[in-house]
Amino acid sequence: MRKFDFTKQLPTHCSDKYEKEYFLIFAIFVAGKSAKVATEKTWELMKWIRHDETPFTYLKEVIKDDDLLSVYLKRIKVGQYARIEKALKDIVNLNVETCTLDDLLACYGVGNKTARFFLLNTRKDAEYAVLDTHILKWLQSMWTLRVVPKFTPTSESLYALWEYEAIKALKKEYPEKTLAEADFEVWKTFAKV
């Protein structure tokens, strides 16, 4: 089993299906947690995978036993148990190589931020902005005369508006970087790992 630490490397290093499945599980875990905590929780859940399994085939086996996933999640103290359990049960049916934004958003507990975080970091030249507190703080630091939301917008129209503004600002501030690289630079500056 390979362990990943997405606090030290760009997730765009996800080179195969295995790594993308692992990263999507991490993306679900990181909602509401620090990247360091989510990295550890993902590892604690995934460390028992056999070398011939992918994260999703492993989870499918765990899910077959009615309460086993719930027991594992509680054992590793991941929190948000109902949301995460339902989300994991939904995502194992996705093809991480081809899933779309709409496919991800159709999964329980996967919102705009998580879906875009996954796609931005696993698709070459993806045009998304992850409106987490780091990007929003960064925007506010750049635009002292504009009021930027403190939290991720929940309405589709507001998310689309601020995503457009964030993409424009990221491209202007980091013209030589992909949006994923620019997002990682902002995260390194504003995150409490």
Residue map of PLM features:
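Structure-specific DNA junction-binding interface
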Residues: 1-73
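C-terminal accessory module of base-excision DNA glycosylases/AP lyases that mediates lesion recognition
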Residues: 1-22, 82-92, 99, 106, ...
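Generic hydrophobic/packing signal
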Residues: 26, 30-33, 78, 85, ...
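Short, surface-exposed loop/turn motifs that are enriched in glycine and acidic residues
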Residues: 31, 35, 74-81, 124-125
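Alpha-helical ds-nucleic-acid-binding substructure associated with the helix-hairpin-helix region
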Residues: 44-108
